[in-house]
Regions:
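Bacterial N-terminal signal peptides
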Residues: 8-20
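Extracytosolic ligand-binding ectodomains
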Residues: 2-7, 23-394
Length: 394
């Protein structure tokens, strides 16, 4: 019996080792879970003076959903599993509550489609998380109010205005009339247009505030020619983000000139008419999912989730600040179906990207335009460059 004791001990040790190896194997086989939160809040714009087609209520969310599907199609080969927890609310208070609830569930990566004020609140409330701004084009978030835990996948107003100004310069439409709407967003867009005009050599022959409160559906043909009667211009720039009057400016100006800005010839982050470099496949997948066209907020949310997935694939982890550090490095070129590799600017967290210039049914051009050079990256000719930004990240 005593002779059997050593063999019994060896047998028990073998069983214990096998059990340990089995446990390790099961742990190794467990997929890396990558939960992402989507937080949506779009303020009610109030009554409009035109019958403008409203933005889809699910703009942004559908782009994030498609990106989760795309990320899982490749992530399964790496044993990564992506999931989306979404909350679309009707007030900034409800948005903050939803964000904290998702945070308590363990989420640390978020895509936010909300105004700048809400983004600032979320950034302060979730300091250990990484937020992707897919909803606010506010320039102050990229120049003076930069948030250390926020990256911007939506183009800034400055990027849009610079993209348009480059195209106007190329076409030699350098004398412009600027019409500015009454809202704070209109004023911000107009400020971006003024900056772009000065930067690229456009000349403002006149600037007019829009002060009418009547329905232009009935009176545009009578009002607009007189309103736009100034010194001669090559183009009319419109700053009307809500769509109160801008749709009625084209074809009604005193001089027969193109209209551009928020209406007419428009710089956008994304549009249905973007089809090259594989974009047509993205458009088809989105339309099959959402039953509508993909817009700029959808694309911003899509590329935000894809940015996370690309970083996780390389890092094999989900730590927010490690992801942020990789995103703003030059080690993570992103494919955004825009003909160039995209990346985030380290000085303000803005996604570098070409900007399509479109009319409602066609792609007209894409900026940066040929000839507008930059010592580091031509896409940095759009928006605020490093010397123009006062942000200092830790």
């Amino acid at each position: 019996m005593r002779q059997l004791a050593p063999y019994a001990l060896i047998y028990l040790l073998a069983i214990a080792c096998a059990a340990g190896l089995a446990t390790q194997s099961q742990a190794a086989d467990a997929p890396l879970q990558v939960p992402i939160g989507y937080l949506g809040y779009r303020p009610d714009p109030g009554p409009l003076l035109s019958n403008v087609i409203p933005e889809p209520a699910d703009a942004g969310l559908r782009g994030a959903e498609l990106a989760i599907i795309d990320s899982n199609s490749t992530g399964r080969f790496l044993n990564h599993n992506y999931s989306l927890a979404s909350a679309s609310v009707d007030s900034p208070e409800a948005l903050l509550i939803a964000a904290k609830a998702q945070h308590e569930q363990g989420l640390r990566l978020f895509v936010v489609n909300a105004p700048a004020s809400s983004l600032r609140q979320l950034s302060a409330a979730l300091p250990d998380s990484l937020l992707f701004n897919a909803g606010s084009p506010d320039d102050s978030l990229r120049t003076t109010d930069c948030l250390a835990n926020v990256l911007h996948s939506l183009p800034s107003r400055a990027m849009l205005a610079d993209a348009l100004a480059q195209f106007l310069v190329i076409r030699k439409w350098q004398r412009v009339l600027l019409i500015v709407g009454p809202t704070a967003d209109d004023q911000a867009y107009a400020a971006a247009l003024r900056r772009a005009a000065k930067r690229f050599g456009l000349r403002l022959v006149a600037e007019k505030p829009w002060s009418f409160d009547n329905d232009q559906r009935r009176s545009a043909q009578a009002d607009m020619p007189l309103f736009t009667q100034t010194a001669e211009y090559d183009a009319v720039l419109v700053a009307d983000e809500r769509g109160d009057f801008g749709e009625y400016v084209p074809y009604q100006t005193w001089y027969p000139r193109p209209v551009a800005g928020t209406q007419g010839l428009t710089p956008v982050g994304w549009h249905k008419t973007v089809e090259t470099y594989g974009a047509a496949q993205l458009q088809k997948r989105f339309e099959a999912l959402a039953g509508r066209w993909m817009n700029d907020r959808d694309f911003a949310a899509w590329i935000a989730v894809r940015s996370i997935a690309s970083a996780v694939s390389k890092l094999r982890q989900t730590e927010p600040m490690a992801i942020r550090a990789l995103e703003i490095s030059d080690q993570l070129p992103l494919d955004g179906f825009k003909g160039r590799k995209l990346s985030y600017r380290p000085w303000n967290g803005q996604l570098r990207q070409p900007i399509p210039i479109v009319q409602p049914r066609a792609l007209v051009s894409t900026s940066p335009q040929d000839g507008f050079l930059h010592p580091f990256n031509e896409m940095d000719s759009l928006g605020y460059d490093k010397p123009e930004v006062s942000c200092r990240f830790p």
